[in-house]
Amino acid sequence: MISASAVKELRERTGAGMMACKKALSEANGDSEKAVEILREKGLAAAAKKAGRVASEGLVVAYVNEDGKSGAIAEVNCETDFVSANEDFKALAENIVKLAAKSNSNTVEELLEENYVDGSSKLKDVITALIAKLGENINLRRFTKFSNENGTIQSYIHGDGRIGVLVNLNADKISDEVHTLAKDICMQIAAANPLYLDETSVDQTALDKEREIYKVQALNEGKPEKIVEKMVEGRIKKYLKEVCLLDQVWVRDSDLTISKLVAKKSKELSAAISIADFVRFERGEGIEKKEENFAEEVQKQMQQSK
């Protein structure tokens, strides 16, 4: 028996119709992940990259040192948007990412043991104290940091901490134009959500899965088997252009890909420029959010403020 709540959740994840979701869940024996694949194979779930992303609250924050040689990005989560807008919570998030950028810690567990920015307590104890004060669970979910003595680090935060990007750019000459290029690349990543730098970094297992899905789609469309492989390879090429940063069309000029943009700027500035790495965080991606009645949520906040 497929529950209404399971159908509702699958519909929210994929955008497919109610009956299509119910049928997919039935075929998948209630397995929601398998149901997503079934819907994709039938062409009913167009937003594949969004599948599985359920909103959660908190902030994505970034910090780059003044010399532009190192920086960090972090996601700090809380339970409601009321707390994510709280000044104490925002200050905590900003201080966490500064600490991450300047410390030697490489894991969340290590960073939690670091002394807080004012040196008064360990980070984990500061978080615990704020939990007690605000009445919500707060946690440092993840962080990444880059350093580059032969280039520059740039960051971009979009939508009040909903999306954050950190870019590591190699450049043998640093100028305002190089910083602008790094910022443009950050905004490209925020908007177009690439999954990889280039084709050589694509996960082969993920690529094989895409290839199988495209094959099923083509067969479902009634295409002859002899041309299915050619269609699949064409769709794989299109997929790679969508998910590989260097192959993406630049959002500000459709005549340029990002690789061509970097080459163009390198020539104009007489500099050797290349993208070393990047990371993109989206608040709450992959985290299940507990649904609450809005009126009850407001009442809860009012009670906490008394």
From Swiss-Prot:
Gene Ontology cellular-component annotations: cytoplasm
GO molecular function, one term: translation elongation factor activity
Residue numbers spanned by region Involved in Mg(2+) ion dislocation from EF-Tu: 80-83
Keywords attached to this entry: Cytoplasm, Elongation factor, Protein biosynthesis
UniProt xrefs under Pfam families: EF_TS
Compartments (UniProt record): Cytoplasm
Primary location class: cytoplasm
Claim: Repeat is one of the keywords in the record: no
UniProt cross-references to NCBIfam families, sorted A to Z: tsf
PANTHER family: ELONGATION FACTOR TS (PTHR11741), ELONGATION FACTOR TS, MITOCHONDRIAL (PTHR11741:SF0)
Family affiliation: Belongs to the EF-Ts family.
Function: Associates with the EF-Tu.GDP complex and induces the exchange of GDP to GTP. It remains bound to the aminoacyl-tRNA.EF-Tu.GTP complex up to the GTP hydrolysis stage on the ribosome.
UniProt protein name: Elongation factor Ts
